[in-house]
Design a protein with these regions (language model features):
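Generic structural marker for isolated residues within well-ordered, non-membrane alpha-helices
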Residues: 22, 33, 63
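DNA major-groove recognition helix of helix-turn-helix
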Residues: 51
Length: 79
């Protein structure tokens, strides 16, 4: 089971926190998925994956880049 490995568990928690921070920002800023995709320099399908919680499709690297391009501090988002 993935959650049995502390490293896997931490990566999952980190991804989840980053995704939630990105979703919260998109909602609070009133951005469409297309507008958010443009800001984050990703395809709209990637934004859709985040908004639908498809955590398995996302890497920490990608989520950190997306958060940073929205002006979020991934380290604070992850706290």
């Amino acid at each position: 089971d993935m959650a049995d490995d502390p490293a896997d568990a931490m990566q999952l928690r980190l991804k989840s926190k980053l995704m939630n921070a990105i979703i919260d920002h998109i909602e609070q800023a009133g951005l469409t998925q297309s507008a958010a995709a443009e800001l984050m320099q990703v395809q709209r399908t990637r934004v859709n994956d985040v908004c639908n919680g498809r955590i398995d499709k996302m890497t920490i690297d990608a989520l950190v880049a997306m958060a940073a391009r929205l002006g979020l501090d991934p380290l604070q988002s992850a706290a």
